[in-house]
Amino acid sequence: MPASKRDYYEVLGVDKKASNDDIKKAYRKLAIKYHPDKNQGDKAAEEKFKEATEAYEILIDEKKRSMYDQFGHAGVDGMSGGGGYDPSAFQGFEDIFGGSFSDIFENLFGGGFSSRSSGFGGRHAGPVRGSNLRYDLQISFVDAVYGKKAELSYTRNEKCSECHGTGSESGSSKRMCPDCKGTGQVRQSTGFFSISRPCPTCGGEGSIIEKPCKKCGGNGLERKKQRIIVTIPAGVENGKRITIPSQGNAGQAGGDYGDLFVFIFVQAHPYFERNGIDLYCAVPISMTQAALGGEINIKSLDEKTLRLKIPAGTQNGKLLRIRGEGVPTGIGRKGDLYIQIQVQIPSKLSSNSKKLLQEISAIEGENENPNLIPLKDLP
């Protein structure tokens, strides 16, 4: 045994009187922490995993543990798996993990684990769906309310026009990968486990291109400009995502296209605001219009002329409503338009206007001791 080999009890972090349950719990913690598929490319983690596995194999076995306690590493030289695969090592192994060991690692690493065969999943030979794309579209307030058709221009991966996505030159073909025998996976034994990884020779494809396409370099894809017409529905809200199926990147090995996600960003309007399906605006009226009432013309969001009735005695800030002039819902109805009244008080008066107001004041009488108004009664 190499002099540098650490004490097995120290490796697992238990004392020499530790029970089998203590050893199992300690190993479980280390196995999950340092497993190679959780720490891909981390050689230090892989070595710690092998070290913990070797220590567990010795200390969990009563006879091996007794020999180790008496003679140290020299007494158990050659008794551990040494990184190889030993089916007998799985006897009672699921008990360490409180049930299905494969379920635990499937949750940790994304599926496909089998302690005896297939390992931790990974890329398999076969069609791969293309990735989704995002497009941010800025539209006007008016277009958001009433809808529109918009032309989108963007670049995406498409199947190579020369090889039609095969990656091979015309007349050429693919051959089975000699290393993985067409499975796209290679198996590596580590302690208790047999782990499958994507084949480095074929990149997990299961086959090798003999003569790569000169246009795409063998990946079967090329970048192209794409132009599509998208219907923006009436009433679309700011931040809404619209999904356009199959307008994302092309897949590989016959895989489907991904989707295009169009995110809507609505510009502010100088005169109108929106709350759900209702629209809001503000109009000024004179103090005589507010006092006497009457009718005025206002412009709607779509430039129609609307007639608005002002009740006599209308107060500043009052909300008036015109039904059916709000946001279309797409189900045959529309929201309403709310108009906030802003009573304009003149800052300068002509002599005649001042005289008339003084006469009104004399008739009405000025209240020098007004009572407070409850805040709930304010418009």
UniProtKB/Swiss-Prot annotation:
Protein's UniProt keywords contain Cell membrane: no
InterPro entries tied to this protein: DnaJ, DnaJ_C, DnaJ_domain, DnaJ_domain_CS, HSP40/DnaJ_pept-bd, HSP_DnaJ_Cys-rich_dom, HSP_DnaJ_Cys-rich_dom_sf, J_dom_sf
GO CC annotation terms, alphabetical: cytoplasm
CXXCXGXG motif repeat locations: 160-167, 177-184, 199-206, 213-220
One example of a Gene Ontology biological process annotation: DNA replication
Subunit-level organization: Homodimer.
Entry's family note: Belongs to the DnaJ family.
Protein name in UniProt: Chaperone protein DnaJ
Lineage of producing organism: Bacteria, Pseudomonadati, Spirochaetota, Spirochaetia, Spirochaetales
Gene that produces this protein: dnaJ
